Amino acid sequence: MERLRRIGIGLLVLLLLPALSGCLGSDGILGIPESNGIPGGLTLACLDSSKYTSMTVEIDYEAGYLPESTSTDMLKQRLESVCDKPDGINFQFTETDFSNDETWSANDVRDLGDEAKAVSPQSGSTLTWQILFPAGTYDDTSVLGVAVDASTVAIFKDSIDDAENIFRRPSAEKIENSVLIHEVGHLLGLVNLVYTSPADHEDSSHPGHSNNEDSVMYWAIESSSIANFFDNDLPTEFDSDDLNDLSGLADGSICLLYTSPSPR
């Protein structure tokens, strides 16, 4: 799966970083050959207000695939709780014809997302992250959502509907709530995507994910394995280790090891 390959490359780079002296600051760039960066590459742009004082979350959705209001309301709350944006966090919804209602690859998400983008992720004093809600499924149909670069996520509602078990517990709406927060958590760099946590909370078998099933960053959240939660109480919160990581990144006590170049 391409997403795991990309995360694997990112983690390999992080393993090599001790050879570099000190931490990279908010302007530090590594020569990773993706001009739109990697998930987590714009985490400080969200956590800090020195450059970007406001944030826009651009929701581009296929007709009939508008996200649940509970999902976007919850995402706004989670971002406001961790991101320093004194001029506010706004959501912009745009119905979009992606001309693809079948199978999506990570490159499709990047390329068609780029075509649909209203503005650059880093424009003036506003940081913009983009979330696609397309028709169709990811090329690995067990994947419910994917973060493909520093500012872009796709959520696959068709696969979410398929993941809802016959008892509707958890419901498709509850699954979407969790998957959306989970994927944006990857844009925030969780878990260990662009830093090394002082806490041992990364799942060794699922890099970039939490080993705590009460965290929204738990590894099963972004895949059809989520149906194994037989009640309707899916995690939608970052746990204390996740929040401590974000706080440490924000105050500089945790080194940020990679930040993105300016995306296209």
Model-identified regions with their sequence ranges:
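C-terminal motif of bacterial Sec signal peptides marking the signal peptidase cleavage site
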Residues: 20-22
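Short, solvent-exposed loop/turn elements at domain surfaces
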Residues: 63-70, 139-142, 163-164, 225-229
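Active-site-proximal segment of zinc-dependent metalloprotease catalytic domains
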Residues: 121-195
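Propeptide-to-catalytic entry region of secreted or membrane-anchored zinc metalloproteases
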Residues: 24-138
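Bacterial N-terminal signal peptides that target proteins for export
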Residues: 2-9
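Conserved small/polar residues in nucleotide/adenosyl-binding loops
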Residues: 258-264
